[in-house]
């Protein structure tokens, strides 16, 4: 018997969930995994992760919120609205139509990555997660899978800083934390799969550093 939906774990910490959901995906489709944006500090690990990271992990499951919205800051509420709009736009791709690909294993390194590709290979959503920030870490290339090698794709990389990163202390040191920051360019499928998407560690730092 296969349940249409299951609660994979009471552990809703975003960093831990990359392992939980990555491993579960070997046996069950991601649409069957209950995945929520929960409160921080996490009730089990007492770890605080940005609300953007929690959503970015929860997207690849059923997606929902498990927290008191009244306790969120204005910046976090703005992020929630953006997250809901994103999920409405891509829910069918992620939960119904798409094929799921595991790109980087959380059990083998500091990064986790996975993606979903539509059946006709015209659309895809990929996610890259960094566990811990490292000093002077080199660039990495996120190599995608499942694309049409001969198709030209419009690539959009969301580099918008985390709302939790938008503090006076951060601004004092000159980090750019203002507004939506999306990098776009065109590339063929074979380039995205063989050469990959170049990722500057400074871009990951803008997302909030750890997690």
Stretch-by-stretch model annotation:
Residues 55-104:
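Catalytic cores of secreted or luminal carbohydrate-active enzymes
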Residues 1, 41-45, 66-68, 74-76, ...:
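Flexible loop/turn segments at secondary-structure boundaries
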Residues 10-20, 36, 86, 153-157, ...:
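Short, surface-exposed, polar/charged, turn-prone segments marking secondary-structure boundaries
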Residues 58, 126, 155:
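Conserved, mostly hydrophobic/aromatic
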Residues 132-211:
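C-terminal beta-sandwich/jelly-roll accessory domains of carbohydrate-active enzymes
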Residues 106-149:
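Carbohydrate-binding surface patches
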Residues 1-70:
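Glycan-recognition surfaces
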């Amino acid at each position: 018997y296969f349940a249409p939906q299951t609660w994979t774990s009471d552990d809703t910490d975003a960093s831990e969930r990359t392992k939980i959901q990555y491993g579960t995906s070997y046996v069950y489709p991601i649409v069957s995994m209950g995945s929520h944006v929960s409160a921080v500090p996490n009730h089990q690990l007492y770890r605080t992760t940005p609300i953007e990271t929690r959503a970015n992990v929860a997207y690849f499951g059923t997606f929902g919120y498990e927290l008191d919205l009244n306790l969120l800051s204005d910046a976090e509420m703005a992020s929630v609205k953006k997250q809901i709009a994103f999920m409405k736009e891509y829910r069918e791709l992620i939960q119904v139509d798409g094929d799921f690909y595991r790109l980087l294993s959380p059990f083998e390194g500091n990064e986790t990555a996975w993606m979903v590709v539509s059946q006709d290979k015209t659309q895809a959503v990929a996610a890259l997660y960094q566990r811990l920030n490292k000093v002077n870490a080199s660039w990495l290339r996120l190599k995608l899978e499942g694309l049409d090698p001969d198709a030209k794709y419009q690539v959009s990389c969301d580099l918008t800083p985390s709302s939790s990163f938008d503090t006076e202390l951060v601004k004092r040191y000159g980090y750019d934390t203002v507004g939506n920051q999306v990098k776009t360019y065109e590339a063929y499928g074979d380039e995205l799969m063989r050469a990959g998407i170049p990722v500057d560690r400074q871009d990951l730092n803008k997302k909030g550093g750890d997690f």
